[in-house]
Amino acid sequence: VVGIICSFIGTQIMGEFGPLVTLRIAIGSGTAFLVAQLVDVFVFNRLRSGAWWRAPLASTLIGSSLDTAIFFTLAFSASFVFLEPMNDVSWSWEVLPILGLGPEAPLWVSLGIADWLVKLSLALIALIPFRVLVSRLSPTTNAV
């Protein structure tokens, strides 16, 4: 809830060219965070009794995928111009090869994929300290 409120507060802070956080960014950010966080917790809870890595990895992959897809779609897709018609995000609709290599898609799709890859990388790296914590805090020494 705090993240959602902060997103909307940001729409009221004015910079040189208008609000520092546009309404579309605030809506996309708040919606993506809320949905992804709820799904992340649900998935983690359902998988927590399995292998040590399954719950954190699966919940993060699913939550991050939802967060990225919802945020970038609401914030930049031409389909959601009605959310804030005065905000020009047409720069994000330029059709380019995905990540500079693949088939062509709007720029915002590449930005979303890059964002998701960063989240995925961080999730994989974070498994190392998570494993250490689980093994040290676990009452049994036979962690799977």
Question: Which residues make up each language-model segment?
Answer:
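Residue-level signature of transmembrane alpha-helical entry/exit and packing/kink sites
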Residues: 21, 25, 29, 52-56, ...
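Internal alpha-helical transmembrane segments of multi-pass membrane proteins
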Residues: 49-65
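Membrane-embedded alpha-helical segments of transport systems
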Residues: 6, 61-70, 115-124
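Hydrophobic alpha-helical transmembrane segments in multi-pass integral membrane proteins
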Residues: 10, 64-82
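Alpha-helical transmembrane segments of polytopic integral membrane proteins
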Residues: 36, 40-41, 71, 127-130
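Alpha-helical transmembrane segments and their cytosolic interface
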Residues: 77, 83-144
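Helix-boundary and loop/linker segments of multi-pass membrane transporters
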Residues: 14-19, 48-50, 99-105
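Alpha-helical membrane segments and adjacent membrane-interface helices in multi-pass membrane proteins
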Residues: 1-30, 34
